[in-house]
Amino acid sequence: MMILRAALAAALTAGLLAAPLAPRAQTPPRIALLSIGTDPVKPNPVWVQFLDQLGQLGYVEGRNIAIERRFAGGRQERLAEFLADLAGRRVDIVATTGDVESVAAKQALPTTSIVMMLVQDPIGAGLVANLAHPGGNVTGLTTLAPELYTKRLELLKEALPAVARVGMLLNPTSANMAAANATETAARRLGLQLRRLEVRDPQGLSETFSTIRRERLQALVVVTDGVVFNQRAQIADLAIKSRLPMMCEVKEFVVTGCLVAYGPSYGALARRAAVYVDKILKGAKPADLPVEQPTNFELVINLKTAKALGLTIPPSLMQRADQVIEQ
């Protein structure tokens, strides 16, 4: 009997050891979306593309991924509040749009993986050591392509052969001053007079356009950051009312009334950023993932705006357009 009991005990013990452990409930990874320019209510085309790509990669919000949205609606002062909150929530990855958000996130969350998607100058901003080997907790996409600044002004001159005095609209508190400086260098090379026009908030736009009319500027080049991007519809409306042609960086501005844009697709960059998030969630380290630069650029023209401004776009420019907006 004693032998039988011992045998049964041994069998039960062996069975318990062999049985798989009951699976523990896994907490889904938590990512945060951080943007100054994004309106907290209206859909943003950049984040729409980002989230769609995450879905295609198999992530379903509320099931296998948790998403924290922190959109400031152009109010840069809210960044500190957002980041303090995210630090307490222990997010796994922060996805950011522009330079300012990315720099603030890196400073506030030095051990959290950060994926940037629309940063102008990640090296100059101190986000990465170099593009090939970021070397820290930040990686992703940059819009930096030095040839773009000259190309945009060349296209503006092609559309408006008589143009000589051009305004450059930018947010001076943004970290993307490299783009502004490169545009000024390109303007000097092309013999254009370039006037810096600084706008820090939506309330300053009316005064800026009063300056444009007073100084009789003939066109406007827009340097994009989160604040400017969020006000693109208002900027386009004021430009048309001032009969001022605009050269912008991305299609999203042309959709709202900018005359011409030449640059990378923000939607394509957002989709690539989602791929970076996927790689990091699967174990890759930001320090080891090279920062990607855009290689494909799109020329977009708004004929409705051209008509409103009384302009005829040269056929040579129309033939090269990737997209023409007529309505």
Language model regions located:
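Short hydrophobic alpha-helices and adjacent helix-cap/hinge residues
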Residues: 1-327
